[in-house]
């Protein structure tokens, strides 16, 4: 989208400690600050051959994640069991009466015990254990002995939705880069990965029914931003600006930039995120920001009206039944790949001038007894929501759709900080709101 996040990877600096002391201890600094924390004297020392118990086999993936965190701490793999006796750490799913994601953590010199309402609470507790350890564990080096202070912690998330958005259309991030983002999200206890997979500049998700979306729609000629990056990489001898070769193709003499995610890539990333307690929220932006698709399937647009309007690109034609069917078919495949409650369909920054000139759009307005092209967009968004709900999904849209008559099942992403009425309007309609006003949350506005 025209205004979306400048996709940036958060960078966490890992400090390497060299010390003659046998045990490396960490000052207590947990982010976010727990609801309650009590520290006592003593510490729990991590050691080879530890035994970890779980109350339920569904926690095995979480313990696998813990083992990844500890890979630079202990030399041998830990033993995982469903027996709670004679274990060094025990993780238990238990109704603690708290909110989703809450947990209790107790460490003593002999053991660590965790109780959590659900899987996400277990992951948060594991992240707290990670933060109780020195940053040196994040890098591979000479093995040292690490300890965790004796503490009692009770914690619960303040916000249900703790998200990060990655725009993979303007700039394509490969599978390993996406996983790195998920690792950093987990470190900060973020739980919703908003994945912007389509826009004017590139289509990034394989749709088997429409192969041209990725065969051609995932690749673009170098634009001014791409050329500037490559020039600076050369001029400044700085590889940070260099576009990797795996994201470049030469086709008929043209240098093309792009890439996309196959179904297998997405399944792998979804599994990786799920292990870390993160939901993946895919976004297929429509009816605007759709030029990457329209360029390959021009019949989706109003006849003869493809390209750019005064500000934004030409949208799809909601007057054509075939266009509506295309949108539903795309989302059918998306629904199958993402086993989560919500899917984002955009709905922002739509250039509606074409609809005023399009006979089919005008016919749709008359047939549906609508009064304007604004109401035509609202009709399209409501029609898509009906399709979402029929397929067991809830729709999210950017705050431009707040006046489109969506049900209370929908959620609104409030990004326009100047749209002051969006938040109270959505809450009055009993719709959940994801607050990300651009003035505070967008990297390119910071």
Regions found by a protein language model. Name each.
Residues 293-299, 304-409, 416-419, 423:
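Active-site neighborhood of glycoside hydrolase catalytic domains
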Residues 20-161:
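Contiguous, structured surface segment used for ligand recognition
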């Amino acid at each position: 989208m025209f205004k979306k996040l400048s996709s940036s990877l958060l960078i966490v600096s890992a400090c390497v400690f060299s010390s003659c002391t046998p045990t490396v201890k960490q000052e207590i600094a947990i982010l976010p600050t727990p609801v309650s924390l009590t520290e006592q004297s003593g510490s729990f020392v991590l050691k080879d051959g530890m035994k970890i118990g779980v109350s339920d086999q569904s926690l095995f993936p979480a313990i696998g994640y813990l083992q990844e965190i500890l890979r630079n701490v202990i030399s041998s793999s830990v033993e995982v069991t469903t027996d709670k006796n004679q274990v060094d750490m025990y993780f238990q799913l238990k109704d603690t009466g708290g909110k989703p994601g809450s947990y209790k953590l107790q460490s003593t010199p002999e053991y660590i015990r965790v109780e959590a309402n659900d899987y996400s609470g277990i992951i948060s507790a594991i992240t707290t254990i990670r933060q109780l350890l020195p940053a040196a564990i994040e890098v591979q080096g000479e093995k040292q002995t690490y300890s965790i202070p004796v503490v009692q912690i009770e914690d619960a998330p303040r916000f249900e939705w703790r998200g990060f958005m990655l725009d993979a259309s303007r700039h394509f991030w490969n599978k390993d880069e996406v996983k790195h983002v998920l690792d950093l999200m987990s470190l900060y206890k973020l739980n919703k990965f908003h994945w912007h997979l389509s826009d004017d500049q590139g289509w990034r998700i394989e749709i088997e029914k429409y192969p041209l979306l990725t065969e051609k729609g995932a690749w673009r000629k170098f634009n001014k931003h791409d050329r500037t990056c490559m020039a600076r990489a050369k001029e400044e001898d700085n590889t940070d600006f260099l576009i990797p070769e795996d994201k470049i193709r030469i086709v008929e003499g043209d240098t093309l930039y792009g890439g996309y995610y196959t179904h297998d890539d997405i399944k792998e990333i979804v599994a990786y995120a799920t292990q870390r307690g993160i939901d993946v929220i895919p976004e297929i932006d429509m009816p605007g920001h759709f030029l990457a698709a329209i360029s390959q399937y021009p019949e989706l647009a109003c006849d003869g009206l493809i390209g750019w309007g005064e500000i934004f690109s030409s949208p799809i034609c909601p007057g054509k039944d075939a266009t509506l069917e295309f949108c539903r078919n795309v989302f059918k495949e998306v629904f199958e790949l993402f086993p989560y409650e919500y899917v984002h369909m955009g709905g922002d920054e739509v250039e509606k001038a074409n609809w005023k000139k399009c006979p089919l759009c005008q016919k749709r307005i008359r047939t549906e007894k609508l009064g304007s092209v604004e109401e035509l967009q609202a009709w399209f968004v409501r029609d898509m929501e009906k399709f979402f709900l029929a397929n067991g999904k809830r729709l999210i849209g950017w705050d431009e759709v707040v006046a489109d008559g969506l049900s209370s099942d929908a959620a609104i992403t409030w990004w326009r900080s100047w749209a002051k009425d969006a938040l109270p309007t959505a809450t009055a309609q009993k719709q959940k709101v994801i607050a990300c006003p651009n003035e505070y949350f967008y990297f390119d506005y910071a």
